Amino acid sequence: MIFMRTEDVRRDIPLLRDHVYLDAASTTPTPLPVVRAMTEYFKEYNANTGRGAYSLVLRATRKLQEAREKVAGFINASSDEIVFTKNTSEAINIVAGGLRFRKGDSVVVPNIEHHSNFLPWLRLRERGVDVRVVKADEGGVVDPGRIEDAVDETTRLVTVTHISNALGTVQDVKEIGRIAHDVGALYLVDAAQSIGHMEVDVRAIGADFAAFPGHKGTLGPVGTGFLYCSTDVQGELEPLMLGGGTVLDVSEDGYVLEDFPAKFEAGTLNIAGFIGLGASIDYMNRIGIRRIQKHGMKMTEELHATVSSIDGIECYGDPQNIYGILSFNINNMDPHDVAKILDETAGICVRSGHHCAIPAMKHLALHETGGTVRASIHYYNTSEEIQLLGETLEEIAGMG
């Protein structure tokens, strides 16, 4: 098999012709083969899935199932363990709202999580759940020992983000999963920043649940995501929404739910989006996830070395334990001003602000100053782009 090179991928993404795109942690530009797969659906078999017996419906239904199987294979799961969602946030909320929590249960969550893996758990306090927030170290690393100190026989669930969206720190998700299971707790991994950047094997890390986006590392379309729910724990979860496609039978007296995952997918899905997601998994496999990870490690090292060497710049996160993401600030400049200058002077796209992770910013005493500038990479980024970022940042730092 001939794997795709970085230059091959760049040719497939027209947006990269005019922009240095360093915001993969937010979303990624869509390759043409993914766009073509979605366009084919709209042009050739634009019909609803599972609702009818004519040929267009059957083709659309088959394509959607193929996409589910591709997604499952990519994370070493079975297709009947995959629930399609609109994003990672919805996937996490399905678990937070669908588990049968009782007063006195506890949940353990780190303090540097994205809001999507923090707010749903905080809200459980309204139901009498003890939400225990574990502090990361100054580099953004969650010490498994602190998780171990926080769990006990009341712990219903432990959750952690694989890679911090704010700092890029990589957590020991396998060890944290072991700790959760040792006390009989369920385990959820937010894999929003790791999927498509490195191998994510849900069975190897011991996840009962894992939440994923389609539009970040996997280069899929926006409006797509998915929840992995292990067959072993599917009986623990109740659907948040009911409607078309979720029931086997209904009467005036009640209803009988469909099996997993159909009972969690109420109404018409984003069919074109998920067909595009299936195409993006094909695209990932054409590149090779190990090649992506090797390139990502190289780019991360170059990114940190380049940016951290500039006078007046402070970088955040443990440099020995980050991947794909670098947060930094220049002197006392507002992060949004830095991002605007990068865009206007060099066409460089980066994120600025709190990154939907205000507790993480408060942990680093960066909340009041507006957060950080964040650069994040993927397989399509090059050493030349990192060099341009460094040169432009040097010019900006010289303004201060």
UniProtKB/Swiss-Prot annotation:
Keyword Transferase in annotation: yes
Enzyme category, top tier: transferase
GO molecular function, one term: cysteine desulfurase activity
Cofactor(s) this protein requires: pyridoxal 5'-phosphate
Keywords per UniProt: Pyridoxal phosphate, Transferase
Superkingdom of this protein's organism: Archaea
Protein family (similarity comment): Belongs to the class-V pyridoxal-phosphate-dependent aminotransferase family. Csd subfamily.
Catalytic activity: (sulfur carrier)-H + L-cysteine = (sulfur carrier)-SH + L-alanine
The EC number(s) this enzyme carries: 2.8.1.7
InterPro entries: Aminotrans_V_dom, Cys_dSase_SufS, Cysteine_dSase, PyrdxlP-dep_Trfase, PyrdxlP-dep_Trfase_major, PyrdxlP-dep_Trfase_small
GO biological process: cysteine metabolic process
Organism: Methanothermobacter thermautotrophicus (strain ATCC 29096 / DSM 1053 / JCM 10044 / NBRC 100330 / Delta H)
Name of protein: Probable cysteine desulfurase
CDD domains recorded: SufS_like (cd06453)
Residues recorded as bearing N6-(pyridoxal phosphate)lysine in the entry: K216
